[in-house]
Amino acid sequence: FKVNIGFKNYIKFLSNESIRMPFLQIFVWTVCFSAITVFGTLAIGLVLACLVQWEFLRFRGVYRVFLILPYAVPSFISILVFKGLFNQNFGELNMFLNTIMGPIYGAFGLEWSSIEWFTSPWPARAMILMVNAWLGYPYMMILCMGLLKSIPDDLYEATAIEGATPWINLRHITLPLLIKPLAPLLIASFAFNFNNFVLIQLLTGGGPDIIEATQAPAGYTDLLVSF
């Protein structure tokens, strides 16, 4: 037999708030997550690439190895390690924060409570972004290191004669010459993170749950691919 659905599913989606609102929340979060990850890892990678290629820095090769090392570790292992570090009850990160922040809050007559990384929406999203930044910055750093090598030193020497500061060099020489070759890779990175199912599934499973989503179970850290 044949059932004619037509536009019924679209009508149901648009008219049912318990389905529409979680979907819109997840869509906005997915776009923000992808964009923040791309530009965040690019910024971290560029800064680190500039530092490890600074001619006055000693042991640059050693620093390069240690900074690229996270890229050699399988992502699912790193995610599971971070899941333990962020554990709300016995994770090392909360223990460290409790040790540091507890006395500071106590000095003002306040009580410090452990951060609920897995049960509160915004801490969970912040955790997702931090873990993804750790996973993504080595890739961006490697790209920036290669592209920085391709920029002629004559340009920097000419601006040095004019008295240009490092900030001016970054704005008018480094970034313009980096963005064009990086653009396709940034778009590819955005698309990858837009569908980053493994990170969400292993770290939070999409949680914490959106209470309003009664007919379509959804979580605050869900991406469209895991919704």
Where are each of the predicted segments found?
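A structural signal for multi-pass alpha-helical bundles of membrane permease subunits
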Residues: 1-227
